[in-house]
Each structure stands twice: as C-alpha cells, then as structure tokens.
Amino acid sequence: MQEIVIPLKEKSYKVFLGELPEIKLKQKALIISDSIVSGLHLSYLLERLKALEVRVCVIESGEKYKNFHSLERILNNAFEMQLNRHSLMIALGGGVISDMVGFASSIYFRGIDFINIPTTLLAQVDASVGGKTGINTPYGKNLIGSFHQPKAVYIDLSFLKTLEKREFQAGVAEIIKMAVCFDKNLVERLETKDLKDCLEEVVFQSVNIKAQVVVQDEKERNIRAGLNYGHTFGHAIEKETDYERFLHGEAIAIGMCMANDLALSLGMLTLKEYERIENLLKKFDLIFHYKIIDLQKFYERLFLDKKSENKTIKFILPKGIGAFEATSHIPKETILKVLEKWH
C-alpha cells in the first residue's frame, strides 16, 4: 500500500492507495453513502470496519441532491445515533458524498472527524483530498461550505471496476485539469500512454500534485486556485442545466475548453498548446457540444463564482502547458466575444 502524507499546520493526515484495509475504530461511526454506491460497495466496507457502533445513512444519488435537505438528513442521523465529539463520519461515494459528509462533519458539534473512502475516479484524484466541503444552493454550486480536512483517505482502485465509462472519463477531466496547470510530465504521460496500463501511477501522481498544492495553500489564497481551471465556466454550465445534463467532470471539460478559448485570445496559449489540450480532451471523449441560450444571463452567472471579488470575475487560465495564471479585470467585451463561439 502506498501512502502520501499531507502535513498541515492544524491537522496532518495520510492518503492510502491500495486495497481497503481493516479499519478499527474505538468510537461510533456513521457511514454516509448514496443509493447506487451503497448497493455496490457497502458490504465490502462493512466487512472491513470494526467500530463501537455503526449506522448507515443513504442519500439519493446525484448532484441535485447535494443540498440542505440531504445535509439535514445526515445531521439527523448523527443526532439519532448520539454521535459525540469523539465519533466520526465515513463518506463512501463520489464527490457529492465527500463534499456533503465533509461539511456535515465540520458543523456537527462544531467539528468532528470524518474519513473519505472515494469510489469514483473524480473523487479519488480530487474531491476526497484537500478539505474543501460544501453543498449547492439555488444560487449556485458549492456556495455554502467550509474547509475541513479528513482524518484519513482510503483510495481503493477496485471500486472503479463498477464505474460506467462516462463516470470514469469525467474523472479523467480532473486529472487533465491538474496536469495542464501543474505538471507537463503528466500531460505527456496522458498523451502517450494507455491509461489502463498506468492507472495506479497516474492516480498516485494526481493525488501527489493535489497534496503538494494543499500543503502550500490550504485555504486557497493563491496557488490552490489553479485547481479551479475550468470551474468558473463549468459551474455556470452545471447551474444552467440544473445539474442534470452533464456530470461534474464533463461540465469542467467544457469549462476548460472555454478557458482555453479565452487564454488563446489573450495570448496565454499558443495555437499549438491550445491544440495539445484539445487533442488530449478528445482522446478521452471529453469534447462536448454545448450551446449557451442567453449569453448575457450566462455571463452574469460567472459572478456567482466563489473566486469573484470586487465585482470582477477571476479566471484561472492555462499559461502554456504545466502552468496557470489567475487573472481578473478582463473586459466584458473580450469575454462575450470568446463565448460567442458557444452561443
């Protein structure tokens, strides 16, 4: 089993990559999963979990259930189980479950521990590591949340065997995001290798990138913003389509394409670099047709992004391959001209 240590000022923890080991706990544990994952993997976890008391809370599957109602269900289960400050929650699922359980554990009794056991590629390489938690609101995605680091993360690649191809590819989008902004060697590996032949190495490399970024910038003041490449546009797309048409990773892939268009227009990408990223997305079937219905309304949605400040939109744009730049004060006319391609 491989380990990555994430040493933070207030709390350090480990990410374990390998077969899920026996987890022995001396306290109560509330497992939260969704209606699909629980049917596939809950028994596998229960076979390996030893705790003072175990209870399971199952939430409906899907991004549209990442809301106040689901959060309340998790907290009600915790109260009914009489969890205390020494108890913990366990997130078994994808990014939606990871985000919600992290947030629920951060506000229950002003904060208790939680463990992440991600079952999707997207959650394994991104959502489960770093402590960003939250829920969606009618106004936008992840607008209510907190920074709350897990006690541990267990990444078992055998969970991925039950993923549909579409879900798997959505996770690859997040790997490409990290590669383009932080690691040109990973870009080259994705371009030249068959991912099936090097999946464990790529997952480890991606988690390691995320870990290093989080250690440098836990609360997203500077370098961690690079992990939001594609997300300003992507979140607007998810909201506009009511979280139903695209998976999160798919929306981010479209968002990266829009960000690339903007970067190209600003001279931050050469045409060759632009085409490299586009071809990489094509390789993993991550090029999608999307039509913006109302250009002005879509533009206004961009201001609801958490990175926006002083009435300006902050974009994370690739600066060549392996680097990025956070940029604001781009004229509205420039943004709308780029988005015309999608209108």
Curated annotation (Swiss-Prot):
GO terms of biological process kind: amino acid biosynthetic process; aromatic amino acid family biosynthetic process; chorismate biosynthetic process
Binding residue positions for Zn(2+): 174, 231, 248
Cofactor(s) this protein requires: Co(2+); Zn(2+); NAD(+)
Location(s), subcellular: Cytoplasm
Enzyme Commission (EC) number: 4.2.3.4
Chief localization: cytoplasm
Any one cellular-component term (Gene Ontology): cytoplasm
Pathway(s) the chain acts in: Metabolic intermediate biosynthesis; chorismate biosynthesis; chorismate from D-erythrose 4-phosphate and phosphoenolpyruvate: step 2/7
Stored InterPro entries: Dehydroquinate_synthase, DHQ_synth_AroB, DHQ_synth_fam, DHQS/DOIS_N, DHQS_C
Annotated function: Catalyzes the conversion of 3-deoxy-D-arabino-heptulosonate 7-phosphate (DAHP) to dehydroquinate (DHQ).
Protein name, as recorded: 3-dehydroquinate synthase
Lineage: Bacteria, Pseudomonadati, Campylobacterota, Epsilonproteobacteria, Campylobacterales
